[in-house]
From Swiss-Prot:
Full protein name: Large ribosomal subunit protein bL17
One example of a Gene Ontology biological process annotation: translation
Any one of the GO CC terms: cytosolic large ribosomal subunit
Organism: Bacillus licheniformis (strain ATCC 14580 / DSM 13 / JCM 2505 / CCUG 7422 / NBRC 12200 / NCIMB 9375 / NCTC 10341 / NRRL NRS-1264 / Gibson 46)
Superkingdom classification of source: Bacteria
Classification via PROSITE patterns: RIBOSOMAL_L17
Gene3D superfamilies the UniProt entry points to: Ribosomal protein L17
Any one GO MF annotation of this record: structural constituent of ribosome
UniProt family annotation: Belongs to the bacterial ribosomal protein bL17 family.
Length: 120
């Protein structure tokens, strides 16, 4: 199985992908570099597929990966609850392809290619 190293150690890379996954579930749209967006896509697709399964084992697998952050203070909902109650039911009829990557221009500081990744 191939993956991008993203210039980090394996622990740093896993932590970054967990953070980005949680942020994407909460905000449903984030701006990051193209390489990170492409790597994030596969992780988020797997999380949404777990959400569609919806059983206890799937919920525990997702909880082991997603950070425990508040998604909506008004609904008193965290990221995991949002994944299983709001995000996953939207894609009940769709078999994969839950995200869209739109390329932006280069970043001002270092010229890194930027992209917006969002839930379809």
């Amino acid at each position: 199985m191939s993956y991008r190293k993203l210039g980090r150690t394996s622990a740093q890379r896993k932590a970054m992908l967990r953070d980005l996954t949680t942020d994407l579930i909460i905000n449903e749209r984030i701006e990051t570099t193209e390489a990170r967006a492409k790597e994030l896509r596969s992780v988020v697709e797997k999380m949404i597929t777990l959400g569609k399964r919806g059983d206890l084992h799937a919920r525990r697998q997702a909880a082991a990966y997603i950070r425990n952050e508040v998604a909506d203070a008004e609904k008193n909902q965290d990221a995991l609850q949002k994944l299983f109650s709001d995000v996953a039911p939207r894609y009940e009829e769709r078999q994969g392809g839950y995200t869209r990557i739109m390329k932006l221009g280069p970043r001002r500081g270092d010229g890194a290619p930027m992209a917006i990744i969002e839930l379809v």
